[in-house]
Each structure stands twice: as structure tokens, then as C-alpha cells.
Swiss-Prot record:
Localization annotation: Plastid, Chloroplast stroma; Plastid, Chloroplast thylakoid; Plastid, Chloroplast
Main location as per UniProt: plastid
Annotated organelle transit peptide span: 1-54
Source species taxonomy: Eukaryota, Viridiplantae, Streptophyta, Embryophyta, Tracheophyta
Name listed for the protein in its UniProt record: Pentatricopeptide repeat-containing protein At5g42310, chloroplastic
Gene Ontology biological process terms from the UniProt entry: chloroplast mRNA processing; chloroplast organization; regulation of translation
Organism listed in the record: Arabidopsis thaliana (Mouse-ear cress)
Gene label: CRP1
Length: 709
């Protein structure tokens, strides 16, 4: 029997890098990752068939890809030795070959007899080495129109036992189907062969490219269960997909990173950059900086886009000095920062710095020949709106026009968002007037901001009028629109209208996302409609949407507020069992729920679990704990929490002192209330109405006591 030589392994796309993190104190071996379908195939490619006729494909066999010298050599070899056009003509003799994976294939079993034409074909191709079949299939799959023909070739090869590396052929097909957004067909095809590392990797890549992260992660887990190691390229694709679809969060990324470490995968440059950017995009610049330092220590220069993403994350976190330092590092490396890099730093100045810093940044851009874009101007408008300088914001609009940057709906949406965040929702009408005067037509994003503005300030009639106007202009609402409307109706107690909006959303073909379900779960919980809430959770899971941290936090909150503490604890345990880490917000909700019912012991236990999970106690959690002791008439323990706060660098706020005064009043220790009030003032807290009311109540009772004596 002729043994066909397997194609050589292709090297990774980038230079390799392996991190030794502080978790490991010994060296690891370098592991070569399993090959993936698209990197394992020989790089030669054949011309794709024209959609109009199959004959054009047969006549264009000579037109091989000439991008690489070795491609030319290999394709010339193919041309000299083998002509596949008779086979392709035979398979397409009844017309264009359609991709029919869900039907029973006629060629699965080896035939007992053949017609003379097919017999001659089989004999003529019996000696073709496997790499040439790989090249043929890769060529056919380069065009969607010839995917059916590619599958027909693979089926024909199996039928006649002409190739002994079908897993690679199937991997090429699966990869091509994923690239053509035919994920369903890719899964059907994968079922026709036992999954191997090659086909696993191809299928995971197809899922990631189609943003079906849940399936990709499930396949990686199943692959590991079967004793195979995932390809590092797949992790890159998964992280890129999460980043691209804005679904990435630090907890999920950390879990993926630990998997990579545990599997001792060799990290390539692309994966390192993807991980760093992923942490930055997920709002965890500290982890991104840590990994950047590790990468630079190995001599790796991060991509400009990676550095800009960290600068942006630092700016979002208000860490402007660190963002400045990284921006300067970018400049000193010889790279001329472009508009996007300046915008990332400008965002930090708008968020935390004085207005002059934002203005000087824009001036510096212009001096260095970097043209401001609409995002630059919108950030500067944000800065002026934050400073209450509406006229200056209008001047920026005029500057945009003078600089040939036409103000668009996005700029006006930022202007409106600034007024919304400052509580000046009445200026909405002024913005609309200004927008109309220069001929800018509102788009979906602008309408979403308008609806959100009206919803936040309980102007629900205005919100619905805006929604109707949006529809009348032919602008289809997106998930943000529906979520905003549903949420604002829920928050103002209009649960029936919210439910109607949820149903209308589905009727119009807009599929609810995790955020939508979380809003409705909270609505049902507030109404104590537990059966409806569980039904909705089931529906959410049936649609492939996994409950996230917000879902579990919402469940803990609504269960806790209703005294269903066993259900709340069950949610916490379920969350941990699926690898999600409970957040401080979740424990705050549980502690507060116990506090409202005076269950101080349970509140303390929840607090202990919180700290044992590695979460730093927040001011909110500690205030809730003080409230729990106060409700349980345990004022000594309440003041012990205050002492704990002082010793651990948590600054008490007005809520802390007000809650302590309430605890003293509850146990009739009125004479101590003025002392707490005075300490509050001395600590720099400004008393609010509730604090002053507590003091008056205590003084009034003390006065009555003196009179009675």
C-alpha cells in the first residue's frame, strides 16, 4: 500500500513568546500548539470558479496565486503532474453542485461496481499525494459558489478511499463555512467525522468568527475533556470576537488566561496583544499594564492599537497621569501618535482634568499636524458642557464647520448626554433646535439618548413621543432603544407598560439580550411574580443567553428584599459553580437585605464570605452592616464597624454617620447623637436633610426628658 506523506507543519504566524507569571516559580517546557485548519494546509491556492459557469474554472487552472514564490513552485508542480478538471466536470455533470449536508450522501459507502468513466477517473487519481488534494479543496473553498463542489470532491475521495487525511480536508471545509457565515452547515459537516484536534480547531474558529462565543468556549472545554489541547489561534479568535462585540469582561478574560497558563500554551505576539487589549477593553487597565510589563520584559513591543486601548482604559478610570506616561512612552518609541491616541488621552482630561488641559491637548494636536476628528470635537464639547459653558460648546460646532468637519448626529448626542448627566434635561429642546438649524438629521443613536434623557427624569410621555417620531422617520429601534424604554418604565413603576414593550420588541424581530432579560427579571422580582421570573430565566437560557453577573446580582437582590434568603444563597452558589465570581455589588445587596430585616448575624456571615472570596469590603457593604446592627439594637457592634472602617482606610460618609445616629436613637441613647453629628462635621462630611432630622429628633427628646425631670 502506498503511504502518502503528510504535509509539513506550518510555523506559527508570529514569533513565539511564553510568559512566566508570578504564579509559577519553575520553568515550563515550550509546547508547540496543535495545528489549525487554516495554518496547516499548504499555502498554495487554486483559482476559484466563476459563479457564472463551471467551465471557466476548468480553463483557469493555470491562474494560480502568485503572491508567494513557494506557491508558484507548488502550483506549477500540480499543473505539471495532475489535471483535476475531468473530475470536477464529472462531479458537476448535472449542473452546479449545491452544498447539501443534511441529506444522506450517496457516496458514504464504497461502491460494489463503477461505470467505466468513473472507474477511469479513480484509477487516474489513485497516486495523487494528499497535499495536492488539500490544495484543490482549499482552492475550491476560497469561493462560496464552489463550496458544494469542494464537499462533493471530499465525498468522492472518501467513497473511493483515495486520500488518507480526511480530517484535514474536513477542517478546510469547516473553516471555509465559518468564513462564509455558514455556522449551521459547519456543525452539520463536523458530525460526519469524529472530532479530532484539527476539526475541533476549525469549528472553534468558525464559531469565534461568527461571534458565537458560547459555542466556541463549550467546544474548547469539550476538546479538553477529550484529551486534546486547543490551538492558541483559537484563543486569539475568541478574545477578538469578545472585544469586537463588546461582550468582554475581566472575569471571563482572566478565566481564559488561566486556561492558557494551565495548558502551558506557547503565546504568540498576536495572542499577547489580544489579551492585553481585552483586559483594557474590559475596564481592567491594571491587569493590562501588568501583562504589558511582562511582555516588554521579554523584548516584545506592543502594537500601537494595544497601547492606545490601555491609554483609553486608564482615561476611563480617571488615571490620567498613568495615561499621560503611556502616551509619552508611545511618542518616545518613535511612533507619531495619531488622532485616536490623542482622543484616548483627551477623554481622560475631559473626565478628571481641568478644562484648560483638554483645550491645550486639542491645540497640541493642531500644532503637530494631527487633524481633530468628530470624536475630538465631541469630547471637547463634553468638557464645555461639564463646565456649564453652553456658548463655548456652540463655538466648537462652528469651528467644526470651519474645519470641514461637518457636525453630525453623534456630536449632538454627546452634547445632549452632557446636559442629561448634569440634570439639565430641559436643554434637550435647545439642542434639537440647534441641530435642526444646521440641517443635521437625527439618527438612531441620537434618538436613544433623547429617550434615555426623558426616561431618567420621568418624562415618559416625551420619551414615547420621541419613540413614535423615530418610527415615523423609518428608523428601526435597536436593543438599546427597547432596553431604555423598558427600563425607564420599570423604574417608575409602570411594569405593565414595560411588559408590553418587551413583547413588542420580540414581535418586531429584535431579539432580547442579557440586559433586556435582566431588566425584566428585576421587574418581575419587584412585583414578586416568582413563577414568571423563573419562566423568563428558562426562556433566556433556551435562547442560548447565559445568565451573567448582573443576572445573578439582580436575583440575589430581589430575593433578598423579599426575604427569600435561601433562594438568594442558592443563586450565589450556582454562580460560583459555573465559574463566575460574585461581585461586591451582589454581596452588598445580600447584606443590605439582611440589614433591612434586622438579621445582623446573617449579615455578618455574608460579610465574612465576601472577604473570604477576596473582595475588599466597600463603603456600601460596611454601611449596610452598620444598619443591620442598628436594626438589631446592637449599637456597640455598629460602632465597631466604624472603627474597622477607620483602621482599614475606608472613609465614612454622611450615610455612615446618619445610620449610626439612627442606631443610637433606636436604643434610646439620645445624648450620644450630637457627639456623632459633631464627628461627622469634623471629618468633612456635609450633613444632609436626614442627618439634620436625626439630630433634631434627639435634641427634642433630650429636651422633653429634662423638662420631665
Amino acid at each position: 500500500m502506498l503511504l502518502l506523506q503528510q504535509p509539513p507543519l506550518v510555523s506559527t504566524r508570529f514569533h513565539s513568546l511564553y510568559f512566566l507569571t508570578h504564579h509559577h516559580h519553575h520553568h515550563h517546557r515550550f509546547f508547540q500548539p496543535p495545528i489549525s485548519a487554516f495554518s496547516a494546509t499548504t499555502s498554495a491556492s487554486l483559482p476559484s470558479p466563476s459563479p457564472s459557469s463551471s467551465s471557466s474554472y476548468f480553463s483557469s487552472w493555470n491562474g494560480l496565486d502568485t503572491n508567494e514564490e513557494e506557491d508558484n513552485e507548488f502550483s506549477s508542480e500540480v499543473h505539471r503532474r495532475y489535471d483535476f478538471s475531468p473530475l470536477l466536470k464529472f462531479l458537476s455533470r448535472f449542473g452546479p453542485v449545491e452544498l447539501a449536508l443534511d441529506s444522506e450522501s450517496e457516496s458514504e459507502a464504497s461502491p460494489e461496481s463503477l461505470n467505466p468513466v468513473e472507474f477511469d477517473l479513480v484509477e487516474s487519481y489513485r497516486a495523487v499525494p494528499a497535499p495536492y488534494w488539500h490544495s484543490l479543496i482549499k482552492s475550491l473553498t476560497s469561493s462560496t459558489s464552489s463550496l458544494g463542489l469542494a464537499y462533493a470532491v471530499v465525498s468522492w475521495l472518501q467513497k473511493h478511499n483515495l486520500c488518507f487525511s480526511y480530517e484535514l480536508l474536513y477542517s478546510i471545509l469547516i473553516h471555509a463555512l465559518g468564513r462564509s457565515e455558514k455556522l449551521y452547515e459547519a456543525f452539520l459537516l463536523s458530525q460526519k467525522q469524529t472530532l479530532t484536534p484539527l476539526t475541533y480547531n476549525a469549528l472553534i474558529g468558525a464559531c469565534a468568527r461568527n461571534n458565537d462565543i458560547e459555542k466556541a468556549l463549550n467546544l474548547i472545554a469539550k476538546m479538553r475533556q477529550d484529551g486534546y489541547q486547543s490551538d492558541f489561534v483559537n484563543y486569539s479568535l475568541v478574545i477578538q470576537s469578545l472585544t469586537r462585540s463588546n461582550k468582554i469582561d475581566s472575569v471571563m478574560l482572566l478565566r481564559l488566561y488561566k486556561e492558557i497558563e494551565r495548558d502551558k500554551l506557547e503565546l504568540d505576539v498576536q495572542l499577547v496583544n489580544d489579551i492585553i487589549m481585552g483586559f483594557a477593553k474590559s475596564g481592567d487597565p491594571s491587569k493590562a499594564l501588568q501583562l504589558l510589563g511582562m511582555a516588554q520584559a521579554t523584548g516584545l513591543s506592543a502594537k500601537t492599537a494595544t497601547l492606545v486601548s490601555i491609554i483609553s482604559a486608564l482615561a476611563d478610570s480617571g488615571r490620567t497621569l498613568e495615561a499621560e506616561a503611556l502616551f509619552e512612552e508611545l511618542r518616545q518609541s518613535g511612533i507619531k501618535p495619531r488622532t485616536r491616541a490623542y482622543n484616548a488621552l483627551l477623554k481622560g482630561y475631559v473626565k478628571t482634568g481641568p478644562l484648560k488641559d483638554a483645550e491645550s491637548m486639542v491645540s497640541e494636536m493642531e500644532k503637530r499636524g494631527v487633524s481633530p476628528d468628530e470624536h475630538t470635537y465631541s469630547l471637547l464639547i463634553d468638557a464645555y458642557v461639564n463646565a456649564g459653558r453652553w456658548e463655548s460648546a456652540r463655538i466648537v460646532l462652528k469651528e467644526m464647520e470651519a474645519g470641514d468637519v461637518q457636525p453630525n448626529s453623534f456630536v449632538f448626542s454627546r452634547l445632549l448626554a452632557g446636559f442629561r448627566d448634569r440634570g439639565e434635561w430641559q436643554k434637550t429642546f435647545q439642542v434639537l433646535k440647534e441641530m435642526k438649524s444646521i440641517g443635521v438629521k437625527p439618527d438612531r443613536q441620537f434618538y436613544n439618548v433623547v429617550i434615555d434623557t426623558f426616561g431618567k427624569f420621568n418624562c415618559l410621555d416625551h420619551a414615547m413621543t420621541t419613540f413614535d417620531r423615530m418610527l415615523s422617520e423609518g428608523i428601526e429601534p435597536d436593543r438599546v432603544t427597547w432596553n431604555t424604554l423598558i427600563d425607564c418604565h420599570c423604574k417608575h413603576g409602570r411594569h405593565i407598560v414595560a411588559e408590553e414593550m418587551f413583547e413588542a420588541m420580540e414581535r418586531r424581530g429584535c431579539l432580547p439580550c442579557a440586559t433586556t432579560y435582566n431588566i425584566m427579571i428585576n421587574s418581575y422580582g419587584d412585583q414578586e411574580r416568582w413563577d414568571d421570573m423563573k419562566r423568563l430565566l428558562g426562556k433566556m437560557k433556551s435562547q442560548g443567553i447565559l445568565p451573567n453577573v448582573v443576572t445573578h446580582t439582580t436575583l440575589v437582590d430581589v430575593y433578598g428584599k423579599s426575604g427569600r434568603f435561601n433562594d438568594a444563597i442558592e443563586c450565589l452558589e450556582e454562580m460560583k459553580s459555573v465559574g463566575l465570581k460574585p461581585s461586591s455589588t451582589m454581596y452588598n445587596a445580600l447584606i443590605n437585605a439582611y440589614a433591612q430585616r434586622g438579621l445582623s448575624e446573617q449579615a455578618v456571615n455574608a460579610f465574612r464570605v465576601m472577604t473570604s472570596d477576596g473582595l475588599k469590603p466597600s463603603l456600601l457593604a460596611l454601611n449596610s452592616l452598620i444598619n443591620a446592627f442598628g436594626e438589631d439594637r446592637r449599637d456597640a457592634e455598629a460602632f465597631a464597624v466604624l472603627q474597622y472602617m477607620k483602621e482599614n482606610g475606608v472613609k465614612p460618609d454622611v450615610v455612615t454617620y446618619t445610620t449610626l445616629m439612627k442606631a443610637l436613637i433606636r436604643v434610646d441613647k439620645f445624648q450620644k447623637v450630637p457627639v456623632v453629628y459633631e464627628e461627622m462635621i469634623m471629618s468633612g462630611c456635609k450633613p444632609d436633610r436626614k442627618a439634620r432630622s436625626m439630630l433634631r429628633s434627639a435634641l427634642r427628646y433630650m429636651k422633653q426628658t429634662l423638662r420631665a425631670s
